[in-house]
From Swiss-Prot:
This is Small ribosomal subunit protein uS10. Belongs to the universal ribosomal protein uS10 family. Keywords: Ribonucleoprotein, Ribosomal protein. GO terms for biological process: translation. SUPFAM superfamilies: Ribosomal protein S10 (SSF54999). One of its GO terms (cellular component) is ribonucleoprotein complex. Part of the 30S ribosomal subunit. The keyword Ribosomal protein applies. It comes from Phenylobacterium zucineum (strain HLK1). It holds the Pfam family Ribosomal_S10. It comes from the Bacteria. Involved in the binding of tRNA to the ribosomes.
Amino acid sequence: MDRQNIRIRLKAFDHRVLDHSTREIVNTAKRTGATVRGPIPLPTRIEKFTVNRSPHIDKKSREQFEIRTHKRVLDIVDPTPQTVDALMKLDLSAGVDVEIKL
């Protein structure tokens, strides 16, 4: 028999919001009777931007800014129909990007 898996991939700039959303998904899945693998932390993507501090002179004086993108992966093994319904109704934070693969 073919086992159905749901893979949920979460991305956010703030790791605290990401961990909170991950905990909500795990608790919802466990409450409805599904088994959960994860959350698995993926490597953080750091994107750096270097700009001149002064608009006129001092080329050597620069400032760096960075954006960190934190990622997590969850696998829900053998989800029940109640699990799918509960995950659809789940309201997550605005700063979290969610990708779901069946």
